Amino acid sequence: ELKELWSTGVDAYDVSLSQNFNLKAVLLWTISDFPAYSMLSGWTTHGKLSCPVCMESTKSFYLPNGRKTCWFDCHRRFLPHGHPSRRNRKDFLKGRDASSEYPPESLTGEQVYYERLASVNPPKTKDVGGNGHEKKMRGYGKEHNWHKESILWELSYWKDLNLRHNIDVMHTEKNFLDNIMNTLMRVKGKSKDNIMSRLDIEKFCSRPGLHIDSSGKAPFPAYTLTEEAKQSLLQCVKYDIRFPEGYSSDLASCVDLDNGKFSGMKSHDCHVFMERLLPFIFAELLDRNVHLALS
């Protein structure tokens, strides 16, 4: 159908002119969450090479204690040359100077198709199905992350598009806010601040205030709320925050005072919270530097 819309078009009716016309259309890009990006593009979005922009030029590394791939400090090479953060050896990966690093080459659609895909020659979508993970190809996970050739490459104009896939903002905002709130409120089992992450911080970063001490205890960090501050935040959202009718759902219903957390927040709730509450709601509850970073 997409091929037909581009090449021959379909008959449509113009009400204002009371006549038929030939309607043609083009698929400019896809919009999805990050896991669905894999299915649509053919590039697997997990593992060391999961970034579809950096591809094999990634700076990701493995966290031995957290047992997962990390992309911390992968983005300083995108800063303008001469930016002071490029030379900062203390606040990012300890001892690392990124002043001479360059971002990966920005590939055109033709380069991706004729150079990257052609060198791997992955199976087509129709041969392996939607996900295409049945058989790993040579070099998969080390040299590339291609698991199939997306059916969208069959569109004659697809290789001429520089931006073919977009990440859904609402999904990203929800994931982002969920992780922030779970860490700020120390939600058991969901906080990113745990013993394993502290051990990895000690290994890779110069942040002695977060290192586990000789007794095996983790110091209380500046980026988490005390019990008093947590209750103050929850009660503020439950009893004091009000929005015009239809602006958002009832955020008060997402407050769980007994367990000290938020639950049941939908994507739009997270969007409203980030846009309207996050810039000021932690001003008196967190350290000023943490609040500025969040807002």
Regions found by a protein language model. Name each.
Residues 1-295:
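A structural signal for the principal folded core domain
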